[in-house]
Amino acid sequence: MSVEILNESGAEVDVSALSRLSRFVMDRMRVHPQAELCVKLVDEDTIAALNLKWMGKEGPTDVLAFPMDELRPGLMTEEPGEAILGDLMLCPAVATRQVDEARAQGQTDHTVEDEIDLLTVHGILHLLGYDHAEDEEHREMFALQARLLTEWQGTRGSGALPDDVLTGEVP
């Protein structure tokens, strides 16, 4: 699997760990070994501009997914084909703010690294065709996201997920 991580955010992020996580998720989701993924870490101005241009929403967001091939969940065959998953745009500054706000409210004890991991898994699932616009889709996607994160954390022995991530509750 080809995973390219580009850190243009100025934030200190373990790009090697992010690459390993991306490969782990792609492997668990049975993505073709020659599939391509690009994860770009960007600043708030960059992600805000992309959010406005592509989503019609003002302001920065935590993650945006730009799928290349039209993949859909549940359509994986015994031998999944080669694919270009697409691009993920992650904003470490927004992730940091989300963690700080959740901690201030006593809602989480996970780290910024855990949040970036969560956003990476979330984005890859979007690239694979998962969505959370409807309640049932939300439950399915967030349950899968929680399972993948739990498995990943078991491989590296750290991290604490908030209850809503583990349960897939609809906010």
Go through the PLM ranges and name each one.
Residues 1-117, 128-171:
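An acidic/histidine-cluster motif and surrounding catalytic segment
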